[in-house]
From Swiss-Prot:
Transmembrane segments: none annotated. Plays a role in the inhibition of host innate immune response. Within the host nucleus, inhibits activation of interferon-beta promoter by inhibiting IRF3 activation. Keywords: Early protein, Host nucleus, Host-virus interaction, Inhibition of host innate immune response by virus, Inhibition of host IRF3 by virus, Inhibition of host RLR pathway by virus, Viral immunoevasion. This is Protein OPG036. The keyword Zinc-finger does not apply.
Length: 177
């Protein structure tokens, strides 16, 4: 059987597997098909967790003080601790940005957040992406308390790979059995 024939039949096989509630006893299924199904299910689950964490993060950044005080979500409670991390890391820069925002409230502000680089024992440099994303979330949370339109700062300063590392961190901490 050629590979093009196999590719054309694969969706049909998957449909048959999903349509049949239970395989008859004694029947066997090609291990490649089982692996394909498992990969597909894992990708769907991972995408669901990732999009849920992004949705929780976006919701957190738009919550007012009363909603934050009354939340029962452990992830949001953790996000709330990131504000102090941002203050400790960025210090006076937070106040300077807030001053600029108050001075020109209708202007789009370009906010570039610096990353703290750590020297490794091999005399190279690295940035811990999870810690950086936590500090940026805290920084954006502080800005949004003044006026909740600054969520773009998060996505302008954080690369996709850094955000993915953060999502993996949250998934590992809160969604692992």
């Amino acid at each position: 059987m050629s590979s093009s024939t196999m590719d054309n039949n694969e969706p049909k096989v998957l449909e048959m597997v999903y349509d049949s509630p239970i395989l008859p006893e004694g029947s066997s299924m090609d291990p490649n098909i089982i692996n394909c199904i498992n990969r597909h299910i894992n990708m769907c689950l991972q995408h669901t967790y990732s999009s849920s964490i992004i949705a929780i993060l976006d919701r957190f950044l738009m919550m007012n003080k009363d909603e934050l005080n009354n939340t029962q979500c452990h992830i949001i409670k953790e996000f709330m601790t990131y504000e102090q991390m941002a203050i400790d890391h960025y210090g006076g820069y937070v106040n300077a940005i807030l001053y600029q925002i108050r001075k020109r409230p209708n202007q789009h502000h370009t906010i570039d957040l610096f990353k703290k680089i750590k020297r490794t024992r091999y005399d190279t440099f690295k940035v811990d992406p999870v810690e950086f994303v936590k500090k940026v979330i805290g920084f954006v949370s502080i800005l949004n308390k003044y006026k909740p339109v600054y969520s773009y700062v998060l996505y302008e300063n954080v690369l996709y790979d850094e955000l993915k590392c953060f999502i993996d961190y949250v998934e590992t901490k809160y969604f692992q059995n």
